[in-house]
Amino acid sequence: MPRVNYIPNCEYSDFLNRIPTVSWDGNVFPVTNGYRFVNREMIGSTSERTFIATIIPPGISHINTCLSTIFKHDYDLLDFFSMSLSIVVDYRVKCTGMGHANQSLVNQLPLLSNEKFRASLHARSMALVSITEHYKKLWCSIYSSEFKIQYWSRDLPQLPQDFFTNLTPEWQRNCALRSDYSRRQALVEIDVLVAQALGLTLEELLAIYRIQFPVMRQYEADTWYDQNGRIIFTPSKGLVGVGLPRTARKADLKNGFVFNVDSPDWTGGDCTDQAIGWDDVKHLQTGTVSVTFDDYTRSDEGERRTVTWQAPFIKPDREDDYKVAWAFFAQDKESA
C-alpha cells in the first residue's frame, strides 16, 4: 500500500474502540472489516473532476477529509462505484452546487439498476481499482465468467486486446489495468455504459462533456501517449511529473536526470549532458526516448529508474472515442 502521512494519536486499543460499527443479520462488526466506497469530502465544481472516489480494502482507516460508505453486498458496492466513476454522475454532483460530498449528497446518487450493463461495468471498474493483492478477496467475490467475453470498443496498439480474455477467477497482477491509455479507455467506456444504463442519448453525453468539463477537455486536448500507452506529455496539474516537461529544463540535469533518444529522426546530437523536453521529440516517427532518474515513490532512499517511450506518439479524441464506444455497446446490448 502507499505510504501514509497520518498515524492514530492514541493507544491502539482506544483507536479500535473508536471505529464505527455496523449491524447486519444480528452481527456487529467494525466498518473497517469490509471493503468500503470512499470519496473526497470537499469538492470543487471547477476542477477537472468533482466527485473523487475509490474503494478501500479492509483494515484501512481515514481522516475526516474523506467519507466512506459500507455496503452489505459487494455487488451493490461495485454497482455504486462503477456509476461514480462516470462523468454522468460527476455532473449530477456538480449540479448540486454543494462544496462537500457529504452523506446527504452521496445518498442522492444513482445505483445501477439495469443488470445487462453490470458485467461490462464491473469488469472495467474492478480492473481500474484492483491494483494490489489487497483487492483479491473483492475480485473473487465479484468475478464473473462474463468478464472474459468483454472487448474494447477500439482495436489500437495502446490497448491490450487480450486483456479481458486473460482474466482469471483468482486475482493476479494482470487482472488490473496498468497503462495510462488502457485506464483512460476504461473510463471512457464507463462513461458511455453509465449514460446508456441511465437512458441518456449520445448527444446528451457529449453535451455534458463539452459544457461541464472544460478542464478535462483542456487536458485531453494536449495529452500524448506512446505506442505502449504511456503518457509522454500532459499539461494535467493532477499528473505533475508524469511524462516529459513541455520544454527542456536544465535543472533536471542538476537533479541527476539522464536523457537518451534513439531514433533516425533525431537531429539533436549526443544527449549526454543534454536535457530533453516534449517539444524536442514530439515529431519522432520511430525510435525511443528515455529518461533515467532517482524515483522516491516507494521509499525516502529512492531507486534508479528508467522510463522509455516508443514513437510515434498519439493524441486521442475523447468525443470521437465516445461515439465509437456508443455504437459498439449499443450493438452489443441489442444482440445480448
Feature map (PLM): residue ranges:
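S-adenosyl-L-methionine
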Residues: 1-336
